[in-house]
């Protein structure tokens, strides 16, 4: 009986927050929008329409600026700093955001005012993968109105010389779904003989659960982790970059290096981004965001 009273008290407290537009009571018991199958189908349709993305870096070495978990609401100091640093970089470069761009509903316009990516095109060099906060509350249609696709690949080259393959996976639900897994296997098999230096997969949800920072959403189901790590190891993937944990992590397994990076969210305890120096080898720096006195 005591447990029932506690449960009712929690429900009453949540219902009392009904005017909060970021609280979706129905979403506690039902899906938060289109399933990964639908998002995958939408993404494939867009990818087929715009064609493949091949980026000529003009040289063999270049830089990848990478951030995660900016959780934009009305505060975007760190994300603005990241974009400013990226734009000031004079070396050949691309940038990747590893998801949870926004914190809750109605924040995409605010985030895009910083990214200035509205109506993303294949000429852009800033790439995004969705996080759970970007998809929750039935926001997929809004997300894709800005960023168009959540599952895609691109590669880099120096003229006719192929360099590196990047693959973006949609793990916003903490799963990939059968269609996306099969697409990944087919893509890796098709590219196996193309001679890439590095194959880098990037996605939001980290594959390895090293803490409970994100509760039950921390990573994939055990069966999915086993399947994905087997595929990634089998087809020669070198790195998997992720976020979601809000803390830096590194795991090496079956020939693949799995990396999670710190958060870009303002006021987070771990505030840093990653600069990957891509060449025959990859080295990493983790600059902190500037501290702001209270």
Question: Residue spans of the language-model regions?
Answer:
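N-terminal active-site segment of His-dependent metallophosphoesterases
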Residues: 18-109
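Core catalytic region of metal-dependent phosphoesterases/phosphodiesterases
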Residues: 78-156
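Binuclear metal-dependent phosphoesterase catalytic core
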Residues: 21-43, 248-294
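Sec-dependent signal peptide recognition
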Residues: 2-9
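C-terminal motif of bacterial Sec signal peptides marking the signal peptidase cleavage site
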Residues: 13-16
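Active-site glycine-centered loops adjacent to acidic/histidine catalytic or metal-binding residues
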Residues: 69, 99-100, 131-132, 204, ...
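His/acidic metal-ligating clusters that form di-metal
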Residues: 85-94, 121, 175-258, 282-285, ...
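Beta-strand-turn-beta hairpins that frame and shape the catalytic cleft
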Residues: 52-65, 153-167, 195-198, 252-258, ...
């Amino acid at each position: 009986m005591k447990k029932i009273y506690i449960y009712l008290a929690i429900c009453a407290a949540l219902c009392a927050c009904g005017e909060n537009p970021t609280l979706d009571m129905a979403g506690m018991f039902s899906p938060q929008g289109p399933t990964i199958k639908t998002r995958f189908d939408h993404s494939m349709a867009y990818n087929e329409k715009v064609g493949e993305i091949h980026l000529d870096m003009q040289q063999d070495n270049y830089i990848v600026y990478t951030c995660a978990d900016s959780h934009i609401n009305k505060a975007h100091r760190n994300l603005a700093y990241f974009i400013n640093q990226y734009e000031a970089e004079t070396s050949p470069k691309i940038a990747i955001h590893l998801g949870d761009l926004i914190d809750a509903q109605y924040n995409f316009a605010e985030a895009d005012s910083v990214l200035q990516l509205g109506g993303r095109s294949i000429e852009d060099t800033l790439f995004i993968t969705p996080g759970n906060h970007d998809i929750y509350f039935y926001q997929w249609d809004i997300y894709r109105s800005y960023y168009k696709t959540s599952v895609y690949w691109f590669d880099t080259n120096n003229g006719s010389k192929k360099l590196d393959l990047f693959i973006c996976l949609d793990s916003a639900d903490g799963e990939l779904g059968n269609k996306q897994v099969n697409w990944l296997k087919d893509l890796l098999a098709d590219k196996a003989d193309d001679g890439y230096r590095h194959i880098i997969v990037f996605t939001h949800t980290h594959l390895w659960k090293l803490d409970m920072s994100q509760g039950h959403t921390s990573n994939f189901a055990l069966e999915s982790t086993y399947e994905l790590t087997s595929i990634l190891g089998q087809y020669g993937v070198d790195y998997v970059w992720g976020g979601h944990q809000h803390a830096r992590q590194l795991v090496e397994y079956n020939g693949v290096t799995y990396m999670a990076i710190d958060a870009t969210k303002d006021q987070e305890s771990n505030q840093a981004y990653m600069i990957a120096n891509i060449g025959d080898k990859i080295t990493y720096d983790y600059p902190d965001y500037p501290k702001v006195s209270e």
